[in-house]
Every structure is written in C-alpha cells, then in structure tokens.
C-alpha cells in the first residue's frame, strides 16, 4: 500500500467535498427558511453571499488537483457543475459585492424555487462525488 499523488488528491477531495456538502446543506436550509418566512431576505442574503466564492473556488481547486494527477473520470464528473458555476456567476444580478443572491428578488416564487432546487441538486452531486472519492482513494491506495 503506497501513498501517491493520486491518493493525496482523493484525500484532499474528500475533505473539500465534506465542506461543499455543508455549504449545500446550509444553502437548502437557508432557502427553506426564506420559503417558510422564518428570516428576512436581507439577513439571509447577507449570510449566503459570502459563501458563494469560497464554494466555487474550492470546487475549482479540487478539480485542478484532478487535472494535475490525471484523474480524467473524476474531472469529467465535475465539469458540468463547474460550467454551471461559471455561467451562474457570470449572469448574477448586479450588486456591489460578490455573491449571487439579491434580497429584492430572492422572494419571487420562481427564484426561490429555483434556488432551492439548485441546493438540492448540488447536495446530491456532492454526495455522489463524496462516495466516488472514497472509492477512488481506496482504489489508488490498493492498486499501487
């Protein structure tokens, strides 16, 4: 059982993906609170907007590690979500700071349901990725 760069990449990806899962869970909880009217949109957007860039950068960093170690299947598994993140950030509402969520439009029914659905889909993708990364780590440790 040898430790190599691929195993290190999968270990870092597991830790990073755990953070991404927590980001997605927070995203779902935050929009559910908005849907049930537990919090006002200004406070909720002020707590969600600072987490957008760290989530996107962490996901991009993990995939750069996969690119450097030549794990093409893991990279291809994440390319659609990277493309969606880039598209979503380029088409964000015009605001003074970084972030995606505008307090004036976040309570619209279609925007709220789209953001909630986005959170659930991201949570599913990150969970599937987490278990695949466990498999990849074990496989890379055993195969060498």
Swiss-Prot record:
Parts of the chain that traverse the membrane: 11-31, 57-77, 123-143
Localization per record: Endoplasmic reticulum membrane
Pfam families from the UniProt entry: Cornichon
Gene Ontology process terms (BP): anterior/posterior pattern specification; blastoderm segmentation; dorsal appendage formation; endoplasmic reticulum to Golgi vesicle-mediated transport; oocyte dorsal/ventral axis specification; protein transport
Subunit structure, interactors included: Interacts with grk.
Organism taxonomic ancestry: Eukaryota, Metazoa, Ecdysozoa, Arthropoda, Hexapoda
Topology of this chain in the membrane: Multi-pass membrane protein
InterPro entries per record: Cornichon, Cornichon_conserved
GO cellular component, one term: endoplasmic reticulum membrane
Keyword Transport part of the UniProt annotation: yes
Protein name: Protein cornichon
Organism in which the protein naturally occurs: Drosophila virilis (Fruit fly)
Sequence similarity: Belongs to the cornichon family.
Keywords noted in UniProt: Developmental protein, Endoplasmic reticulum, ER-Golgi transport, Membrane, Protein transport, Receptor, Transmembrane, Transmembrane helix, Transport
UniProt topological domain (Lumenal) ranges: 1-10, 78-122
